Each structure stands twice: as structure tokens, then as C-alpha cells.
């Protein structure tokens, strides 16, 4: 969503926070017993899109940058993708076994493939429209992938590939559910799309906060309402994750009132058919990214957002503060005990015990 770009810089300036230093240890009662934070690198950079590729953490960033950090070699590789005089911002990233894909926000929308071996960059999709703004991208398998963007007409902009990312096709509006006026998506952490097998969930915000579901890899869709706060441009679902095909969690809130802790978290036990609020007045306010902890039986969740890093071990009802650093936008797990978080000016490793 375009307005999120403007609010991000303002939000960082206005928020007051205490940063946890490297190797800070946080103890909490059960579940995990401690967490330490290792800074992998710092730079003048904004990162909202990361993925784990074996020993590498790939990222898309602002100022036309992408790269990776090699966890084994402790080295960073970074490159720019120059397109005329444009300063691209990559907020969507996805991968196949051979390539990493980067998708820019705003107009024009530019989607690039990057060969993992030789780092060769190729433009595979371009869309020009004053309203174009892509928010998230994922792959079902090595051949099929999907990206979601704000409506340019009266439905989400959805592009798919069936040939490993070589070509992308935009789904016609008459094949998609109609969006409400003012309903779009947020490019907060590349978590607007969640895939489990063939099941696909898309989440929306703004005037409506809904979940769009496809059981057949974007061929047909159903839509359900959620109780998440909605009605204003910067309210709704900013992030989602599913532990399996049945258990999911959505979060977000009101970006302009980041301390609001009600109607901002919900869970499902039936694959997204119904959603129930949880954790009212508990834990965080605005959420940028939520992720289930691997091996946590759908009960353990990590959130990064307006109040730092928080952890729940009971499905989102109660939350423990792990860090008050509000500069993280996105997080991904490597395994149960290790995650990578990125955001404003840094990428770190979170170590849980």
C-alpha cells in the first residue's frame, strides 16, 4: 500500500525506544528460556524482504539494492539493479532452487530474477500503471509462483508464473473476487501471502480486513471477513502466517495508533474459514510481521512491530517482551532455535534457547 511508504519514515522518527545490544540475553519463564541477539551487519538501508537459502540470508532493500549475508563465511554480498534513473525498492522476495526473485513497489512494477550461482540479473515482468503497487510474492514449488499487489481496477493485482519465473501473467479481474473501495494490501514484511502445499491465503487491509483463500494455486478464490480493526487507510491485516493447513494467525492493527492493542490479532483453527480475536489488550499494538516457531505445535509465535520483538507460547493470548528495539520490520526462522530479523539499518540473528 502506497501510504505505508510515507508513514514508515515518520514512524521511525517518532517512536522512542531502548535498543538491546549485541549478545543481550533475555530470560523468560517457560517455552524458550533465553534469547541473544547477534548483529550480522549494519548499513544505511531499509529491508522488509528476506528469505533463507541454506547458509545464506537473501534480502531486497531500498535504493535498488539486493544481496545476501553468508552465515558460514560471515560475509555480505550486495549489488544494485539500475533502471534508468529509478531508485527501486524491493519489498517482495521469493526463490526457486536456481533463482531468487525481487519485485519492486510503485510504478513501474519491475520483477527480476537473480541466478544464485552467477548473480546474473534478468527482468522477467514489467507493469506500468499509476496505481500499480506490489506487496508480496511467494512460490508454491520450483515452477509455480504468485505475487499480489494493490488493485489497479476493482480486484487485487495478482500475477502468476507456471514456468519457474521465466514469464508472469496477470490474472484477469473477472476471475478474482472484487475488492471493496479502499481495500488493498500492506508491503510491510512480505507476509501478505502464505502458502501451505496448494493452499494459498492473501490478507488485506484498509477499508476492509479480509482473507482471500485459494485451494488450487490461484485458479479459484473465496473470501472471508475477519474481526481485525478496519475502516481507515492504515488499518487492517499487515501480516499472516500458517503453522499448517488449519492453524493460522493474522495481525496488524492501526499503523497511525501503534499502541492500540485491541482487535489487532486473530487466529483460525479451520484453515481460515473463521477467525477469532485473541490477546485483547495484551502484547503488541501494530504488528509488521508474525511467524510461527518451528516445532511449536502452532502455539509459539514471534512478532516484530511497534513495540519490538515479542513471543507467545499459547497461540497469541499472552506475550513476553524479548526486545524493545522497534527497528525490525520482518523475521524468518532458520530452525526452531534461530531466526533472522531485518529492518532499519541492520540485519541480526536471534538465538533462542
Residues covered by each model-derived region:
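Repeated scaffold domains used in trafficking and secretory/extracellular systems
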Residues: 46-49, 88-94, 131-138, 234-239, ...
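Recurrent small/Gly-Pro-centered beta-turn motifs in extracellular repeat architectures
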Residues: 61, 103-105, 147-150, 197, ...
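Bacterial Sec-dependent N-terminal signal peptides
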Residues: 1-32
Amino acid at each position: 500500500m502506497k501510504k505505508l511508504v510515507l508513514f514508515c519514515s515518520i514512524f521511525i522518527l517518532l517512536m522512542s525506544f531502548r535498543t538491546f545490544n549485541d549478545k543481550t540475553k533475555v530470560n523468560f519463564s517457560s517455552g524458550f528460556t533465553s534469547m541473544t541477539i547477534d548483529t550480522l551487519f549494519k548499513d544505511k538501508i531499509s529491508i522488509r524482504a528476506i528469505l533463507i537459502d541454506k547458509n545464506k540470508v537473501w534480502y531486497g532493500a531500498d535504493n535498488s539494492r539486493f544481496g545476501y549475508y553468508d552465515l558460514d563465511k560471515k560475509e555480505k554480498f550486495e549489488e544494485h539493479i539500475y533502471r534508468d534513473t529509478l531508485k527501486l525498492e524491493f519489498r517482495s522476495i521469493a526463490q526457486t532452487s536456481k533463482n531468487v526473485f525481487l519485485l519492486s513497489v510503485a510504478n513501474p512494477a519491475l520483477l527480476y530474477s537473480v541466478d544464485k550461482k552467477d548473480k546474473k540479473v534478468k527482468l522477467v515482468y514489467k507493469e506500468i500503471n499509476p496505481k500499480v503497487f506490489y506487496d508480496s510474492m511467494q512460490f508454491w514449488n520450483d515452477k509455480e509462483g504468485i505475487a499480489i499487489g494493490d488493485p489497479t481496477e476493482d480486484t487485487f493485482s495478482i500475477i502468476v508464473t507456471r514456468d519457474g519465473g521465466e514469464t508472469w501473467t496477470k490474472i484477469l479481474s473477472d476471475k478474482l473476487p472484487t475488492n471493496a473501495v479502499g481495500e488493498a494490501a500492506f508491503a510491510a514484511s512480505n507476509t501478505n501471502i502464505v502458502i501451505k502445499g496448494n493452499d494459498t491465503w492473501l490478507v488485506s487491509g484498509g477499508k476492509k480486513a479480509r482473507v482471500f483463500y485459494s485451494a488450487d494455486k490461484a485458479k479459484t478464490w473465496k473470501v472471508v471477513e475477519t474481526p481485525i480493526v478496519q475502516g481507515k487507510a492504515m488499518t487492517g491485516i499487515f501480516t499472516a502466517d500458517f503453522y499448517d493447513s488449519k492453524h493460522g494467525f493474522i495481525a496488524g492493527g492501526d499503523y497511525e495508533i501503534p499502541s492500540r492493542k485491541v482487535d489487532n490479532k486473530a487466529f483460525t483453527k479451520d484453515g481460515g474459514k473463521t477467525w477469532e480475536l485473541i490477546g485483547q489488550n495484551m502484547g503488541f499494538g501494530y504488528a509488521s510481521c508474525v511467524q510461527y516457531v518451528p516445532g511449536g505445535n502452532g502455539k509459539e509465535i514471534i512478532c516484530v512491530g511497534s513495540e519490538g520483538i515479542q513471543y507467545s507460547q499459547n497461540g497469541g493470548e499472552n506475550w513476553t517482551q524479548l526486545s524493545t528495539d522497534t527497528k525490525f520490520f520482518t523475521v524468518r526462522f532458520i530452525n526452531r532455535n534461530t531466526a533472522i530479523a531485518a529492518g532499519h539499518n541492520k540485519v541480526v540473528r536471534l538465538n533462542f534457547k
